[in-house]
């Protein structure tokens, strides 16, 4: 089935969604692999989405309205894209409905979630349906996960057979702009962290219910980072 857009950035007026929109626009403007990609921005408010695009002089191929509280609007949105980049958080409250809509419309899904409870829940509840639909559900594509995953993969590749990397430690170092005054985190990141630490017990209990074959490796790594 033909799709209107290659990519929709959902939650484009949020802190992270706005940044993603700006970066994607810059990539598309430079040509290369992103040249000709039809990307759109999505969210609840046409006014806010249009204002954000105008503010940064962005040229998305479309503006799509959808709300995580309205399943029909989500399916209408996801059906128009090949891939949805979901930037609406905290994911434990707003993410699952988007995952469900993507599976229903056979749309690939990517997020930047760092919330183990949400990732585990999606694996437990939706992995089989996603596989049956041929849909990719890719979590944790952000700074707290990508360096760990790529770093571990790089390290493992340094051990040619019969060598084997059995353990790897990863450390993050963050550079802050010289003119920054104090450390800061966006409100959604703060709320996600509060609920994440507050729900550690529930996350552990959820993992005890996991079948032995459930692939919880990614979210286990997230807890350690």
List each language-model region with its residue ranges.
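ADP-ribose/adenylate-binding Rossmann-like module
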Residues: 90, 101-119
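N-terminal Rossmann-fold cofactor-binding loop
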Residues: 42-46, 67-68
